[in-house]
């Protein structure tokens, strides 16, 4: 009976299910985009291969917001610490032309000592001041090839090579070049430290904190756990607002749909009540139909989310969208709960109808 009632009005059912699907897709995609970008950034930072990362006081864990540069002379003091094998200073800038990409200014020798060097798809390492390396994902997304010219940060660069992704940034230039462009002479945004043995990391971190008590000292093996929305000011609030908007959309659509349904089925409700149907039975019918609509919409929304992810990644290879079972279930639950709340008043209204008046309704 419930399924028949839902299918009896196919157009309204379709529109309602689409609205719920949009709600579910909106939640999954917003969370998937933010989570994917955070996780991808964390993996790139861990991929540098260092054991410890040092940033200026109060610097953000997100490299594009890494704070004021530090004196590069700090690197010489860090090299003197016990168990330290290599230290690589890095200056971080971000390029906002055609997207937002992190640019690393590196000293090739020290960066190679920490990261074991780049894996080249084509070309060669940095040799001239205007050389730039791009990773394979950036090259694919922007259609960049070795030997081409690039204009970023108001500067013309020569693409010296395309490297495997996962070394902290997508673009790499000489440290001295980026220092001059940024007006940050003898400065660095980050120091990466490679220890002689991984188990010496806690001891080295203690020494660094004694040497630089106000600086941010982070072990890179736990970096992924730090890349959450709560560590980026405003991101958690943004996600909650978007979820709230999605819930309101679902609530209003279900409310209007079920309210109209109750009005149209007034005589039917009168017949049921005249045959002895209880208020609880009427409420269960309305809420069961709502649940069925929300389930159909949720399933469609999940499918639409995976379809959109496939399309977006094909169109924008540098984009990362993480869809997890946890958020698929949460988005579905949000849609169903919001739908039931939206149907609560129409269900209550239906249960309160007087059978005599309902049967006389035209």
Sequence positions of predicted segments:
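Hydrophobic, regular-secondary-structure patches
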Residues: 25-102, 206-210, 216
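Hydrophobic alpha-helical transmembrane segments of multi-pass inner-membrane transport and secretion
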Residues: 10-37, 233-268, 291-300, 341
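Transmembrane alpha-helical interface segments in multi-pass membrane proteins
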Residues: 246, 267-312, 330-334, 338, ...
């Amino acid at each position: 009976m419930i399924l028949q009632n839902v299918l009896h009005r196919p157009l309204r059912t379709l529109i309602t299910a689409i609205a719920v699907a949009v709600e579910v897709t909106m939640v999954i995609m917003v969370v998937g985009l933010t989570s994917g970008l955070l996780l991808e950034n964390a993996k790139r930072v861990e991929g540098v291969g260092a054991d410890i990362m040092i940033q200026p006081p109060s610097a953000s864990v997100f490299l594009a917001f890494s704070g004021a540069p530090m004196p590069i002379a700090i690197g010489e003091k860090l090299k003197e610490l016990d168990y330290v094998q290599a230290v690589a200073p890095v200056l971080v800038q971000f390029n906002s032309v055609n997207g937002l990409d992190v640019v690393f200014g590196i000293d090739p020798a020290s960066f190679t000592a920490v990261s074991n060097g780049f894996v080249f798809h084509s070309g060669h390492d940095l040799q001239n001041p205007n050389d730039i390396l791009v990773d394979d994902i950036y090259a694919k997304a922007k259609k960049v090839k070795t030997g081409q010219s690039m204009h970023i940060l108001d500067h013309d660069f020569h693409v010296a090579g395309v490297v495997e992704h996962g070394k902290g940034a997508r673009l790499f230039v000489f440290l001295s070049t980026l220092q001059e462009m940024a007006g940050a002479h003898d400065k660095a945004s980050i120091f990466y430290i490679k220890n002689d043995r991984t188990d010496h990391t806690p001891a080295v971190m203690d020494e660094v904190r004694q040497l630089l008590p106000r600086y941010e000292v982070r072990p890179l093996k736990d970096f992924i756990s730090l890349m959450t929305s709560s560590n980026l000011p405003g991101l958690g609030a943004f996600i909650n607002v978007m979820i709230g908007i999605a819930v309101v959309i679902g609530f209003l659509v279900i409310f209007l749909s079920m309210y109209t349904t109750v009005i149209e089925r007034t005589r039917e409700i009168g017949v049921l009540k005249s045959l002895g149907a209880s208020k609880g039975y009427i409420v269960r019918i309305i809420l069961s139909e709502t649940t069925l609509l929300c389930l159909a919409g949720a399933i469609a929304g999940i499918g639409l989310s995976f379809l959109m992810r496939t399309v977006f990644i094909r169109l924008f290879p540098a984009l990362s969208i993480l869809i997890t079972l946890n958020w698929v279930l949460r988005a579905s639950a949000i849609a169903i709960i919001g739908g039931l709340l939206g149907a609560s008043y129409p269900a209550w209204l239906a249960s309160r109808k007087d059978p005599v008046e309902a049967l006389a309704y035209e």
